[in-house]
């Protein structure tokens, strides 16, 4: 009996800690974190940069030692390709003044950014890398993101710049129709409903397992296989996007978001 009570206590503590991890993960990536100095509507000053040279500048704060910077390289390449087609936008890479040979690092990542500066991150209010900020011609930060972005945030960033995201949706999402087809053909797909237990108990798909978002960091490592295809479901797209980031950080490489079927065009 004592061992059983101890095991239950350990599980409850693990779930509590996982909830704290989710909240920490989410708020660290929020541009409105009061502890994060650089935020939207703040003016940014970098020596040698005249913001008025472009209507908008996409600033990337990077580090050669940052694994999430390297893992975001494919997105940065798509971003650079879209910006290169516009005359009123540019990209600017900023590295810490303590680093060197950042240009060689960008070539290694195959991210074509010509404007490169070294600066004190603390003086700019940048506490985490990678950081992406959209800066207007007056040097005012209009939007910013921190960390490796999940698919919907990548699309949101591109949309705010008026750019089309060329990444195939098939790489990160699956439609209802395609999911039904995979299940009908008995393909190995694990559908995870990340809503809370009450919502799941009220109504859920027969084939879905319930792992609430606040339990995901702990339970995913213990209950899911890195080799399986995982489909995430929730009524809130921002929650599935966050869940995608959590699983990606833990090494899951076959993660898809369940999205509605496309609406056929009206005649």
Would you name each region that the model predicts?
Residues 7-23:
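Hydrophobic membrane-insertion alpha-helices, especially the h-region
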Residues 20-43, 156-202:
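Flexible, polar/low-complexity N-terminal or interdomain linker segments that lie immediately upstream
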Residues 44-46, 112-119, 211-212:
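Short acidic-hydrophobic, aromatic-tinged amphipathic segments that line or gate anion-handling sites
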Residues 50-70, 76, 192-193:
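Short active-site neighborhood of thiol/selenol oxidoreductases, capturing the structured segment around
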Residues 70-109:
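Structural microenvironment flanking redox-active thiols in thiol-disulfide oxidoreductases
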Residues 108-111, 118-158:
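Thiol/disulfide oxidoreductase modules built on the thioredoxin-like
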Residues 163-168, 233-265:
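Thiolate-centered catalytic microenvironments shared by cysteine-dependent enzyme domains
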Residues 168-238, 242:
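Positively charged, proline/Ser/Thr-rich regional signature most characteristic
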């Amino acid at each position: 009996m004592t061992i059983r009570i101890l095991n239950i206590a350990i599980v409850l503590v693990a779930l509590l800690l996982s909830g704290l991890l989710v909240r920490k993960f989410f708020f660290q990536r929020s541009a409105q974190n009061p502890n994060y100095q650089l935020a939207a509507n703040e003016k940014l000053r970098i020596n040698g940069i005249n913001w008025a040279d472009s209507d908008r500048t996409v600033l990337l704060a990077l580090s050669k030692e940052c694994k999430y910077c390297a893992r975001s390289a494919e997105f940065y390449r798509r971003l650079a390709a879209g910006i290169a087609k516009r005359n009123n936008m540019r990209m600017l890479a900023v590295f810490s003044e303590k680093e060197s040979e950042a240009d060689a690092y960008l070539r290694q990542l195959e991210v074509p950014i010509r404007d490169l500066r070294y600066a004190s991150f603390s003086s700019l209010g940048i506490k985490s890398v990678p950081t992406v900020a959209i800066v207007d011609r007056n040097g005012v930060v209009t939007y910013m993101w921190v960390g490796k972005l999940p698919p919907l945030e990548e699309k949101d960033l591109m949309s705010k710049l008026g750019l089309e995201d060329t990444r195939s949706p098939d790489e990160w999402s699956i439609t209802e129709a395609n999911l039904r087809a995979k299940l009908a053909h008995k393909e190995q797909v694990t559908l995870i409903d990340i809503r809370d237990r009450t919502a799941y108990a009220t109504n859920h798909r027969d084939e879905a397992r319930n792992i609430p978002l606040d339990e995901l960091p702990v339970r995913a490592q213990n209950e899911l296989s890195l080799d399986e295809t995982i489909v995430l479901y929730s009524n809130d797209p921002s929650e599935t996007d966050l869940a995608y980031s959590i699983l990606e950080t833990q090494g899951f490489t076959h993660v898809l978001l369940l999205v509605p079927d496309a609406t056929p065009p009206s005649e």
